[in-house]
C-alpha cells in the first residue's frame, strides 16, 4: 500500500500533533547524531516542544560552545562581506573617475582644436556652442574684475584727495598761526622801539636864552 504524502500544515488534533512531534523529534535527534559521527561535523540541535519543554543535542562538549563558534563565524563573515563591499565600491568609484578623466581629456583636446577628425557635424556644433558659452562667461568675469579694479582705483583716488585736503587745511592753519605769532612779535618790538626812542629832552642853556641848543642823549640800556 502506497503511503500518501503528508500535507504540510498544522495538525489540528492535539493528540495526533503530540505523537507526530515525538516521532519527528526523535528522528531529527538521530539524524543529527549520525551526521556528527559519519561526517565528523559539529552539530548543535535545540528543540522546544509546543508546551515549552527543551530538547537539545550537541556533538561538542556543550551547545553554548557551538553557539559561540557560530556567532564568531557570523561576525567574521559580516566583516569579510563589508570589506568586499568596500573593495567593490572603491573599484566602481575608481572606474567611474577614470571614465570622467578620459572624457574630460577628450573634451579638452577638442576645445584646443585637436582630435576633431572623427567628430560629426552635431558634435562640432555642440562644441562650438559650448565654446561660445565659455567665451561669454569669460568676458563677463573679465568685465566684473575690471569694474572692481576701477572702483578700487576710484576709492583710492577719493582717499588721496581727502588726505590732500586735510594736509592743505592743516598747513593753512599752521601758516595762520605762524603769521599771528609774527604779527604779535612785531607789535611788541615796535612798542619796545618806541619806548627806547622816547627822548628826555634836556635843555642846556648855553648862552642867551634866545639861542638854545638841544642835545640828544642816546637811549640808556
UniProtKB/Swiss-Prot annotation:
The keyword DNA-binding applies. Disruption phenotype: Retarded root growth, and altered root meristem size and stem-cell patterning. Late flowering phenotype. It is found in: Nucleus. GO terms for biological process: flower development; maintenance of floral meristem identity; positive regulation of transcription by RNA polymerase II; regulation of auxin polar transport; regulation of root meristem growth; vegetative to reproductive phase transition of meristem. Its main location: nucleus. Residues 87-177 form the K-box domain. Preferentially expressed in roots. Expressed in lateral root cap, root epidermis, root endodermis, columella of the root meristematic region, the vascular cylinder in differentiated zones of the primary root and in emerged lateral root primordia. Expressed in pollen. InterPro entries: MADS-box/MEF2_TF (IPR050142), MEF2-like_N (IPR033896), TF_Kbox (IPR002487), TF_MADSbox (IPR002100), TF_MADSbox_sf (IPR036879). It comes from the Eukaryota. This is Agamous-like MADS-box protein AGL14. The lineage of its organism: Eukaryota, Viridiplantae, Streptophyta, Embryophyta, Tracheophyta.
Amino acid at each position: 500500500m502506497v503511503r500518501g504524502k503528508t500535507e504540510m500544515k498544522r495538525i489540528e488534533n492535539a493528540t495526533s500533533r503530540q505523537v507526530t512531534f515525538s516521532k519527528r523529534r526523535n528522528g531529527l535527534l538521530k539524524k543529527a547524531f549520525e551526521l556528527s559521527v559519519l561526517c565528523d561535523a559539529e552539530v548543535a540541535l535545540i528543540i522546544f516542544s509546543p508546551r515549552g519543554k527543551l530538547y537539545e543535542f550537541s556533538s561538542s562538549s556543550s551547545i553554548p560552545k557551538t553557539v559561540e563558534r557560530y556567532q564568531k563565524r557570523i561576525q567574521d563573515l559580516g566583516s569579510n562581506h563589508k570589506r568586499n563591499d568596500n573593495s567593490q565600491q572603491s573599484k566602481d568609484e575608481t572606474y567611474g573617475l577614470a571614465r570622467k578623466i578620459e572624457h574630460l581629456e577628450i573634451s579638452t583636446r577638442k576645445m584646443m582644436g585637436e582630435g576633431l577628425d572623427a567628430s560629426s557635424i552635431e558634435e562640432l556644433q555642440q562644441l562650438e556652442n559650448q565654446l561660445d558659452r565659455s567665451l561669454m562667461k569669460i568676458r563677463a568675469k573679465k568685465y566684473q574684475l575690471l569694474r572692481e579694479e576701477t572702483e578700487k582705483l576710484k576709492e583710492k583716488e577719493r582717499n588721496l584727495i581727502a588726505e590732500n585736503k586735510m594736509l592743505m587745511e592743516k598747513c593753512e592753519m599752521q601758516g595762520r598761526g605762524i603769521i599771528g605769532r609774527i604779527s604779535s612779535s612785531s607789535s611788541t618790538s615796535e612798542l619796545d622801539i618806541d619806548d627806547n626812542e622816547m627822548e628826555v629832552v634836556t635843555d642846556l642853556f648855553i648862552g642867551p636864552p634866545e639861542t638854545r641848543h638841544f642835545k640828544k642823549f642816546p637811549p640808556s640800556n
